[in-house]
């Protein structure tokens, strides 16, 4: 296991994209050792490739819902056949849950430990970020970086800071740097990095890097065997419901 984990908070706007590296080599401590902010999308493949020995936890949908992909493919040929349309009483559920949500999104929404509904990659502006990730993913593969959308193999996994914080029983609200220091008492950073933490994008990247550590330690919730095929198409959001202290071995 490598001693450094990276978190990447991705946006279509480089001024809202941040990457943070945490060094875990000192017992009982997670030290911020690198911050890249702002960060352009075209700079990300080389950055990840250069640090491929580390785990990367990325805040972006790795894929689209299976049903959404099928719907777009089928409807591109013409109107949907009557047999493919749910009864009218189920239209809202079909639109907002079955089409909009991936398997991993429904899990986070329904699990009583987490109860966080991710924004849908199929709808809203998040689709543009997911499309950008599709380009980054292709470039990473061309650099020889292994990509498993389920996040079980290779160096890269998907996460969602709001769900990660909720799973750690910290609520879903974004945390400031002082709040992160209170929630994760083992976090530390040199003063030169502190100006970067004024915005929430870098702080979100810190949460992603914490999830990367949890994934390294086998502490994140993984898809079940029967869910694995879908997770490898749609992506799987990694969060940990274990004690935060376990990130530093307590």
Residue positions per predicted region:
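RNase H-like (RuvC/DEDD) metal-dependent nuclease/polynucleotide-processing core
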Residues: 1-6, 10-250
């Amino acid at each position: 296991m490598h001693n450094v984990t990276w978190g990447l908070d991705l946006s279509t706007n480089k001024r809202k994209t941040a990457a943070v590296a945490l060094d875990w080599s000192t017992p009982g401590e997670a030290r911020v050792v690198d911050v890249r902010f702002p960060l352009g999308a075209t700079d990300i493949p080389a950055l990840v490739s250069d640090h491929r020995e580390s785990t990367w936890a990325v805040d972006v949908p790795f894929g689209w819902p299976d049903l959404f992909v099928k719907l777009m493919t089928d409807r591109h040929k013409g109107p949907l056949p009557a047999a493919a349309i749910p009864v009218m009483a189920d239209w809202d559920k079909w639109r907002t849950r079955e089409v909009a949500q991936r398997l991993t999104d429904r899990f986070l929404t329904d699990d009583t430990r987490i109860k966080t509904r991710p924004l849908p990659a199929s709808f809203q502006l998040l689709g543009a970020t997911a499309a950008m990730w599709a380009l980054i993913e292709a470039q990473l593969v061309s650099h020889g970086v292994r990509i498993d959308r389920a996040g079980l193999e290779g160096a890269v996994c998907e996460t969602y800071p709001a769900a990660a914080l909720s799973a750690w029983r910290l609520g879903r609200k974004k945390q400031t740097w002082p709040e992160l220091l209170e929630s994760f008492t083992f976090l530390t950073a040199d003063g030169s990095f502190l100006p970067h933490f004024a915005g929430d994008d870098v702080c979100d990247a810190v949460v992603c890097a914490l999830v990367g550590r949890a994934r390294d330690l086998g502490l994140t919730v993984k898809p079940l065997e029967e869910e694995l095929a879908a997770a490898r198409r749609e992506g799987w959001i990694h969060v940990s419901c274990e004690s935060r202290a376990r990130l530093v071995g307590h």
